[in-house]
Amino acid sequence: MNILIFAPHRDDEILGVGGTMLKRKKQGDHITVCLVTAREGEVLPECTQRIHDEMRRVHKYIGVDQYIGFPFGANRLENVSRIDFNRAFEDAVKQAKPDEVYLPFWGDMQKDHQLTVDGAMVALRAKNIYSPKRIYAYETLSETGINTPCVNNMFV
């Protein structure tokens, strides 16, 4: 089975579905991790190489088969053209051909997490050529659930 995990930032995939990744790898599944904010050096530039190396070591330990990095910077996704953004997600889905997809929870307050869900859902909608069997949301223990939408029941 092909598994595709969209991670807004480095370590979101480990914090959110690290245990699931280990379990699925032991079952023989093919795991692709797609890092949405892979552009280097914008946040903590002095630590960039160390953080990247740590991510690669963890991916190797878990058995990640494929890594896809988007050319977008952390906390700058709102400035990316929606066409370019959505196309990157569509290309990742075409490349990974996932049976299952894991996304951050849509109610997370962190804007990069919200936009990751938006981009992925555009790429995964039924009209596209390739659709997975299942889509799951994962928690990253940051601001999940804080951004609960207001549902109004009265209008003035």
What are these regions (language model features)?
Residues M1-F6, K23, Q27, V43-E54, ...:
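Metal-dependent de-N-acetylase/amidase catalytic core
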Residues H30-E40:
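A short beta-strand-loop structural module common to alpha/beta enzyme folds
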Residues A7-K25:
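Di-metal (Zn2+ and/or Mg2+/Mn2+) metal-binding site signature of metallo-dependent hydrolases
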Residues L15-G18, C34, D118:
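Generic hydrophobic alpha-helical membrane-span motif
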Residues P8, V36-A38, T140:
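Cofactor-binding loop segments of dinucleotide-utilizing enzymes, especially the Rossmann-like FAD-
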Residues L35-V36, G69-G73:
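Short glycine-rich catalytic loops that host catalytic nucleophiles or stabilize transition states
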